[in-house]
């Protein structure tokens, strides 16, 4: 395999170019380079996975940079959805086992929202893609996260105090308990029931939300009293009384959290 530094340099180059509409990216070339890099690791006989990776790269480096400001959030959500579809195909159709993890990590800094899509296998952590969007500021001074679909994302040490999170979809997100996030407590939020049962599953350590407005898996303690979980379009038929240890494993990418950001 190519060295980690060399591979990440490629991703940085792609990401910087993607911020400009005037620097077209050879998406096919980038897709082929990634497939060759991970041939036999993420890709085996299933060509569908590589096609879905191409679709994901298109969302990141073609459609998102060209989207109008009012369409950025929808375009961002499309990139996350395309990544989730790629991950599902990779896990389902390639005979490569489940030792690796694929996940997007979200980082906030003022008006800047950066999402780094990562591959993790033990201590080997690599970037698959990186996207950035600029958030709009509301009259009340909060940055608008409304409508963002964060399900399947990982958060570590992010401060949401200056962000409007009322209509964020947190379904199947993972929050680091070693470096917890900080949330504001606006009047519209409500407390959520939670089951504080320690869980250790495939090295998972963190707070994993389910898609039915509840916290399903918890190790440690995290500040979730002031979060409103919303995913009204998902119908979870599982019993609310099922013990946590018997809860079904989510199909979205699951990640292992470590201190700070997996580094």
From Swiss-Prot:
Compositionally skewed regions (Acidic residues) per UniProt: 233-244
InterPro entries: DUF5508 (IPR035124)
Sequence ranges of Low complexity compositional bias: 245-263
Highest taxon listed in the record's lineage: Bacteria
Transmembrane regions: none
Chain intervals for the UniProt region annotation (Disordered): 233-263
Protein name according to UniProt: Protein YpjB
UniProt gene name: ypjB
